[in-house]
Design a protein with these regions (language model features):
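Conserved beta-strand signature within the Rossmann-like core of class I S-adenosyl-L-methionine
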Residues: 81-92
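Short acidic low-complexity segments
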Residues: 45-56
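Short, charged/polar "capping" segments at the starts of alpha-helices
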Residues: 30-37, 97-99
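A short glycine-rich, Lys/Arg-flanked "PGG" loop and its adjoining helix->strand segment in the class I
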Residues: 71-83
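Active-site-adjacent loop/helix micro-motif of nuclease/hydrolase catalytic cores
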Residues: 61-73
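Conserved class I S-adenosyl-L-methionine
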Residues: 16, 21-29
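Class I S-adenosyl-L-methionine
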Residues: 114-140
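Conserved Class I S-adenosyl-L-methionine
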Residues: 101-121
C-alpha cells in the first residue's frame, strides 16, 4: 500500500485499533477498501463483510448519508459491537468532492444520542475520515 503524501505512515489496521485475533466487520466499504486501503491485518484477525454471529471487536461502517447513519447507528452498536468494542463511522471528507451531509459533528451528535462517545479520529484515506465511537465504561 502506498501512503499518500501528507498521511501518517501508520498502517490503517493499527490506526483502527485492530489487534491480533479480533473479529472485524466492514460494512458498505468502497470498492478496493480491503485490498488497496486496509492493508495487511494482524495475525488471527477474522474479517467479515456481512454481519453474522456478533459481537465484533471492531466494526467499520461507511456512511455518506446522515439519514442512513441515524437509522442504523443504534443497531450497529446494540447488535454488532462487543461491549468493549469499537465502532468506526467513516464519512466522505468535504474536500473529497463526494456529495454528503455527513461530518464529524453529525457522527458525534448522533452517537451521543445513541449512548456512545467518540474517542479518536482517523484519516482513512484521501476520501474518507473516521471517528471511533465506544460505549462509556459504566455502560459496558
Amino acid at each position: 500500500m502506498t501512503v499518500p503524501s501528507g498521511y501518517s505512515g501508520t498502517p490503517l489496521p493499527t490506526k483502527l485499533g485492530i489487534r491480533p485475533g479480533d473479529r472485524v466487520l466492514i460494512d458498505a466499504a468502497p470498492p478496493g477498501f480491503e485490498n488497496d486501503t486496509l492493508g495487511e491485518l494482524p495475525d488471527g484477525v477474522v474479517l467479515h463483510r456481512r454481519a453474522g454471529r456478533a459481537p465484533y471487536d471492531v466494526v467499520v461502517v461507511f456512511r455518506d448519508d446522515a439519514t442512513t447513519y441515524r437509522r442504523h447507528v443504534e443497531r450497529d452498536i446494540a447488535r454488532t459491537v462487543a461491549p468493549a468494542g469499537r465502532l468506526w463511522v467513516a464519512w466522505p471528507k468535504r474536500a473529497s468532492g463526494v456529495l454528503t451531509d455527513m461530518s464529524d459533528d453529525v457522527v458525534r451528535r448522533v452517537g451521543l444520542q445513541a449512548g456512545v462517545v467518540d474517542t479518536k479520529v482517523c484519516a482513512i484515506d484521501a476520501t474518507w475520515s473516521g471517528l471511533m465511537l465506544v460505549r462509556r465504561v459504566r455502560d459496558r
